[in-house]
Amino acid sequence: MTKNTIQESVATGRRKQAVSSVRLRSGNGKIDVNGKTLEQYFPLEVQRATILAPLKMLGDVNSFDLIIRVSGGGVQGQVIATRLGLARAVLQEKEDMKQELKSQGFLTRDPRKKERKKYGRKKARKSFQFSKR
């Protein structure tokens, strides 16, 4: 058996309910998101630019292949989760990029989640109408 020489970085990113697993390996710029191309899965240019921002800091975007598995949450949550996973994968490849990635906010996990609904209320914070008399 021959040993596989392709080095691969695997990282996970999360945002709200969205979870993204990113595999970064050397290649020719092929990006696969849940079996689709990046343009098919994320049709807006703003979303694609947000996802690829950590990779653009490396310089050459076309020298890496990405395999992304993302599930849960909404589209924007999936975008931010994928960006965090990609930034962590880039950090595994080049540890000297940590300060630059951190200063741009790419390594920061947004801890905000949906607040649970409380009993005796309509929603998490909204109450029923109160009448004094």
Curated annotation (Swiss-Prot):
Residues 97-133 are annotated as: Disordered. One of its GO terms (biological process) is translation. Disulfide bonds: none annotated. Transmembrane segments: none annotated. GO terms for molecular function: RNA binding; structural constituent of ribosome. The keyword Zinc-finger does not apply. The keyword Ribonucleoprotein applies. Keywords: Ribonucleoprotein, Ribosomal protein. GO terms for cellular component: cytosolic small ribosomal subunit. It comes from the Bacteria. Residues 114-133 have a biased composition (Basic residues). Belongs to the universal ribosomal protein uS9 family. PANTHER family: RIBOSOMAL PROTEIN S9, SMALL RIBOSOMAL SUBUNIT PROTEIN US9M. NCBIfam families: PRK00132.1. This is Small ribosomal subunit protein uS9. It comes from Chlamydia muridarum (strain MoPn / Nigg). The gene is rpsI.
